[in-house]
């Protein structure tokens, strides 16, 4: 779901606590400014069966302006992955080639590691992670999903 809110201190905490107080898990949460000053957009991914109840509770919050349940058929979603992979002289070329073929950007390469950045759907990031797993993932982090509707 996408939530348009006033960009005020404590809004994120109130939204997150409203969801967690009801016993719902937040699978992904991303917040950022919009093209309208003083407004932020939250993209929250939670269990499907809880969306209607969550929307009702969030609509009661003062700083919430609009809530949209995103239709997967009419939504573009994206997230970013940073992943640090173990490499050596024998594997460096292979790892970098696989990353390039996957559309990842090489951010840093050291003697025994390489860091890549990939932007894409959750499925694409998971596929890339599985591709590099045999080489040894040292560290990785993913942002929360962001999404925008393609049709109004």
Predicted features, each with a name:
Residues 2-152:
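Long, contiguous binding/interaction regions
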């Amino acid at each position: 779901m996408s939530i348009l809110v006033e960009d005020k201190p404590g809004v994120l905490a109130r939204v997150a606590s409203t969801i967690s107080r009801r016993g719902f898990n937040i699978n992904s949460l991303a917040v950022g400014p919009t093209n309208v000053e003083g407004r932020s957009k939250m993209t929250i991914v939670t269990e499907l069966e809880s969306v209607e109840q969550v929307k009702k509770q969030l609509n009661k919050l003062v700083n919430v302006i609009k809530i949209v349940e995103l239709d997967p058929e009419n939504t573009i979603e994206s997230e970013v992955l940073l992943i640090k992979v173990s490499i050596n002289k024998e594997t460096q070329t292979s790892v970098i080639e696989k990353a390039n073929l996957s559309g990842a950007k090489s951010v840093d390469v050291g003697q025994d590691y390489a860091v890549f950045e990939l932007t894409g759907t959750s499925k694409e990031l998971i596929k890339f992670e599985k591709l590099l797993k045999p080489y040894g993932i040292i560290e990785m982090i993913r942002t929360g999903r962001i999404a925008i509707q393609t049709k109004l």
